Amino acid sequence: MSKKIGLFYGTQTGKTESVAEIIRDEFGNDVVTLHDVSQAEVTDLNDYQYLIIGCPTWNIGELQSDWEGLYSELDDVDFNGKLVAYFGTGDQIGYADNFQDAIGILEEKISQRGGKTVGYWSTDGYDFNDSKALRNGKFVGLALDEDNQSDLTDDRIKSWVAQLKSEFGL
């Protein structure tokens, strides 16, 4: 496979970057190109048919600062024909009322611009009150809690990447 997937992530503490690297490795280094959004241009999103968007939920239901800076520029990208998967890091105990909100905010914007969401993830095994990342009872993407459930991260990533390989047709 040639590098078909662009994985764009923002990170504040390094957790989301670490997860991005694990996801890349699970797909295969020759398939996924990582882009730290603090150093990327929004036009870089145009280079890929398949996208993976990673963002931690910051503060109380907010986008991570690098994504916040690019958010309005997403209006300039045509996502029609692109399959887009999302993953987020968050704390379901400390922030139970807005767990994974950031990926819900990004998914809504990108879907409005024509992106087709793939990689929905079950809420089974999570304990939270509310999330902007819910669509029809599922998360819009892989929900990770490195604060309270880090022991589940590797297995969740393996399952999600297998699901994405099928949905991306790889």
Swiss-Prot record:
Gene Ontology biological-process annotations: electron transport chain
Keyword Lipoprotein appears in the UniProt entry: no
Pfam families listed in its UniProt record: Flavodoxin_1
One GO MF term attached to the UniProt entry: electron transfer activity
Family the entry assigns: Belongs to the flavodoxin family.
Classification via NCBIfam families: flav_long (TIGR01752), PRK09267.1-2 (NF006736), PRK09267.1-4 (NF006738), PRK09267.1-5 (NF006739)
Keywords, comma-separated and alphabetical: Electron transport, Flavoprotein, FMN, Transport
SUPFAM superfamilies in UniProt: Flavoproteins (SSF52218)
Protein name as annotated: Flavodoxin
Keyword Signal set for record: no
Cofactor(s) needed by this chain: FMN
Organism: Nostoc sp. (strain ATCC 29151 / PCC 7119)
Described function: Low-potential electron donor to a number of redox enzymes.
Residue span, Flavodoxin-like domain: 5-165
PROSITE patterns documented for this protein: FLAVODOXIN, FLAVODOXIN_LIKE
